[in-house]
């Protein structure tokens, strides 16, 4: 599990390789990740948007931005949490994801809550020792 906290917003991520949706012979690898966002702060916040940096096993970086997560812009009162699962296809058997959520307070102030960097690992990775 990977965890980061920004201004009382805790983001925990767990990833897994999805063999049944992957085809290694065609360089298609699919990963699922589950995110839990917890408001440990003292004020209500709303998740407005997301920004992901996805880096494949060759170091190629793709940036993804969008409104909300899984079609929602959840509002979190102090002590509340929101959990969702999504997925990421790669052309390599391993990679890395990291990013941030744009959060907004009731007063209209926006800030970036860090999504911790987490690895995308499959059993198809060939490691070489030098």
Swiss-Prot record:
GO biological process: error-free translesion synthesis
Gene3D superfamilies registered for this protein in UniProt: ApaG domain (2.60.40.1470)
Superkingdom: Bacteria
Residue stretches making up the ApaG domain: 3-127
UniProt protein name: Protein ApaG
Designated gene of the protein: apaG
């Amino acid at each position: 599990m990977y965890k980061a906290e920004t201004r009382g917003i805790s983001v925990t991520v767990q990833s897994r390789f999805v063999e049944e949706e992957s085809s290694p012979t065609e360089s298609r690898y699919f990963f699922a990740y589950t995110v839990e966002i917890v408001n440990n702060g003292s004020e209500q916040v709303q998740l407005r948007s997301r920004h992901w940096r996805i880096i494949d096993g060759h170091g190629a970086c793709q940036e993804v931005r969008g409104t909300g997560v899984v079609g929602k812009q959840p509002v979190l009162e102090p002590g509340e949490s929101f959990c969702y699962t999504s997925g990421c296809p790669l052309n390599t058997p391993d990679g890395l994801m990291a990013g941030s959520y744009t959060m907004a307070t009731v007063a209209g102030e926006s800030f970036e809550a860090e999504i911790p960097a987490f690895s995308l690992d499959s059993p198809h990775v060939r490691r070489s020792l030098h």
